[in-house]
Structures are given as structure tokens and as C-alpha cells.
Amino acid sequence: MMRHQAGLSGLRGATQQDLLDHVVMEERLAAAVPGRLLGKSAYHALTFGWLMSGLARAVTGKDMRLLFREELAEPLDTDGLHLGRPPADAPTRVAEIIMPQDIAANAVLTCAMRRLAHRFSGGFRSMYFPGAIAAVQGEAPLLDAEIPAANGVATARALARMYGAIANGGEIDGIRFLSRELVTGLTRNRRQVLPDRNLLVPLNFHLGYHGMPIGNVMPGFGHVGLGGSIGWTDPETGVAFALVHNRLLSPLVMTDHAGFVGIYHLIRQAAAQARKRGYQPVTPFGAPYSEPGAAAG
């Protein structure tokens, strides 16, 4: 499942109402029959989140929104990691989404997208659902749902802190976040050469993270998020970074993806220089972990 080989990447028949109800989606996927790509890498763009949350709920009895706070934000002592819209009294706020706020409904385009998703493109079908644009317009109802693969809300510093712990053997600022054994396991088995059946490029999915199929230009692993935000880590060099922005369903997504390569190159250069001259202390911006119901500071 964490290699995107469950054969359940498609979203045929799911309505916008279904997709905004995580329990419904977990139940639908639990009852679904795996498709022909079972056992083959086929990016589960949206269904991956409900597969994971359904499993987590069965094991822990807790939903993924709570697990984000208890297993990520709290041990890392940061408020900037949420699933969905942060509570009104949380220090973290959702930035205004720039795109596609002003895109008008287009019946022809909607019909074409639905047919494309249904009949031809496995990759597009794994990401598309009716009403996708409306879900991120206005007050963005998508943020009030529990969609673990698509509606995480994070600050760049908090996301980089999580990946930084992985880059540093599972520890950051004296906090043990993951065991060294688990971090070692994350770095293994990343030599996939066959292309992903949905995205048509080899992404080396392993334990939920993917690599980047461009030689050694972006060593390490991480994950690109909805709209083109990204978190990345390279335990071999101890480098990690995160880039987040407030664009969704934007034509600039591919530009963002290409930009990661250049940004990462500059970060690696800066890290190498810092190792030679010594590290400089950085002001600890960003709110620490906030207990539910605590007043925003």
C-alpha cells in the first residue's frame, strides 16, 4: 500500500459529497475490488490518504486529523502541521488561496474532464473528482474535510522541521522523532526503474515517500503536495527543505516542479559552505505546539 501498489488508485463513481466525507471514502475503498494494476506502482493521488487513515483508525481508534497533531506536531513541538483547516484559536492560519478563485463554471470543460478521467487516463482519474474547483473556491470546503492525501496545512518551517529530523537520523534539537532504524529503512529499496503506471515516470515510491527521476540532481526523497508544495530530505548529506505556497489547480504547477531542482541545488551549495565556515544560529520563528483550545499567542 505504501508503495502505491494497492490497485485502488481510481475514483470512479465518487461524488464531491463522498470525497468530503472520509468515513464514506474509507468504507468505499475497504469494499472495493483491486484493479488490474494491483502489485504495480500506480500513483494513488487521493485514495492513498483514505487507505492510510482507514488502516490507522482500525489500529489506533483515532482519526488522521488527531494523529497529525499527536504524532507529528506535538513531538516536533510545532503548531504548523495540521490536517485540514486549523482550529480558530490556533496560531497557524490558512493563507488565502490565489487560484482558481475566479474560474467560472464551464459545462463543456467539466464534461471533457469527467470523460478523460473515466475512460483514458489512470493518472488523471486518480486526481480528478467532480466539483474539484468548487472545493477550493470561496471558503474552500476541501479544508473542512479529512483528506489525508490532499488537505494538509503546513508552514514551511514546520514541514522542514519534520523532514529535518529524518535528515538527521530521526532527531532534531535533541528531540527523538523517529528511530535510526526506521530512518535507515526509509533510505533503502529506492531503485525503481520501471515507470509508475499513472504518472509514467519512475518515482521510487517506498514507505509513502518518492524519489525524483532525474539522476543525482535531487538526491533523497520526500513528496510533492497538492498544488506543488514540497518537503524533501537527504539523510546522506543531512539536508532538508520545504517550500509551500498558496496556489491550487494552477498552470504554474509544472513551473514549481521544475523550480525545485534549482532551489535544491542552491540549498545543497549553501549547506556545503556552512559546513566549512560553521553554522550560524537561526531565530526560531514559528509557534510551538499548541494544545487544543489554548489561546493563540
Name each model feature, range by range.
Residues 51-52, 145:
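Short hydrophobic "helix-edge" motifs at membrane interfaces and signal-peptide entry regions
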